[in-house]
Amino acid sequence: MRLQFAPYILKFKEPAGTSRGVLTEKITCILRIFDENNPTKFGVGEAAIFPGLSPEADDRFFYKLMELQANIRIGKSTDLLKFPSLQFGLEQAIRDFTGGCHGIYYESPFVHGQKSIEINGLVWMGDFDRMIERIEQKLSSGFRCIKLKIGAIDWSKEVEMIKYIRDRYDADRLEIRVDANGGFDMDNVLPRLKRLADMGVHSIEQPIKAGTPALMRFLCEVSPLPIALDEELIGKYTREEKLNLLEEIKPAYIVLKPTLIGGYSGAQEWIDLANEHGTGWWVTSSLESNIGLNALAQWVATLHVEIAQGLGTGALFVNDFESPLYLEGDRLNYNPGISIDREAIDALDWRE
């Protein structure tokens, strides 16, 4: 067997505001695995490394990738525990290859166009007027759950924005989730959590920065608003580390990003532990291209989820790959008549 990789720069249709600044492009790494006796038949995956978040987002990534290539040639396993995006990309490529190289990563009614996945409508950070415009677009499209990235503009403006939504839609009709990306501090977090709870917000992701478990546990104990851990999960590699986090902090929810926590296998371990401890969860994409997003959605469709998931829609980038995924209202669907364009993938800058 052989493994090749192709670095690829995804270009945003419009600047995307995040807690880490404004993004205009994002690097990713496409993988393909094949039998050298039949190189035209290959399994495809994506290692969607995320600078600033992925624990392996430095020179180690490409050194580990070359080690992985060498080991695959001789049939030797590679320890990818601390390289979650590579783990996820390799899992995808192997599943595609063993499934016949048709872009089917998980067999389910979803890939036959018979079921769909409810997702939240993500509203990116921006100035007040732009965010209100984006909210209106999501509401008119039929979303029943929206997620707001907060922490980029003045707090009073963010409160005004949420109040604007609540004045039109009560909590029974529209669920509002917010993601602070660690943007609050201990001087302001408690009154802000109370204000959000008073406005009927469903939950908040990562109100303070990751890495202070005692403070986060305190917040989870006293907050009137359910707290979901996000960045806090990154870097917890073993089952014991994951279990300790859930038992120490006791969050209401965890947010699972397979690209950042070890792929299908790493995320499934979190799910199993969360279910054992009565912790809620949902799955979120992490700026993957349509290759990774397709592979992620197919897995989520097998989980029998009952709440809105945080999956992307493939509409962020101008140079993305063709995808069988499409949106109807707030439901992500799969068109079995469309598959990833393997000729376009074959034309990438592949490296040995």
Regions found by a protein language model. Give the residues of each.
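Catalytic beta/alpha-barrel core
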Residues: 124, 146-155, 177-182, 200-212, ...
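Active-site-adjacent beta->alpha loops and helix N-cap segments on the catalytic face
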Residues: 128-129, 152-168, 184-188, 208-221, ...
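Short, well-ordered coil/turn segments that N-cap beta-strands
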Residues: 113-119, 142-144, 171-174, 200-202, ...
